[in-house]
Amino acid sequence: MTNNKNVILSAQDIVVEFDVRDKVLTAIRGVSLELIEGEVLALVGESGSGKSVLTKTFTGMLEENGRIAQGSIDYRGQDLTALSSHKDWEQIRGAKIATIFQDPMTSLDPIKTIGSQITEVIIKHQGKTCLLYTSDAADEEDSV
């Protein structure tokens, strides 16, 4: 993958499995990706293709019967697959890495612009001013 840009998040050969009724279900098979600083990465796929499961691996939100069976996830030099405690994940989840879930009742407000909602999250988690990030949020909205 890319070596000449600032890689924020790197996932290599991720395999996610779930224990279901005395069987092992493989939900993610060998996914690799890189998130580059200043760029937007979109996960696109059919319902049930594993988008939400993959993003849950980046935030430590897999269900109790799930696990990362193979691969590595590096966030700015930190091995996320080595994190085990809820306290460790609290330092990452929401503050550094966040997910907008598909459930329309818990994700985006249909009466607000996407840009204003992205700005709200940036202000809450990064403590930046609204004016500074309004431009960045608009850029993100245009790229969706």
PLM region spans:
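Single conserved hydrophobic/aromatic residue that forms the stacking wall/gate
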Residues: Y133-V144
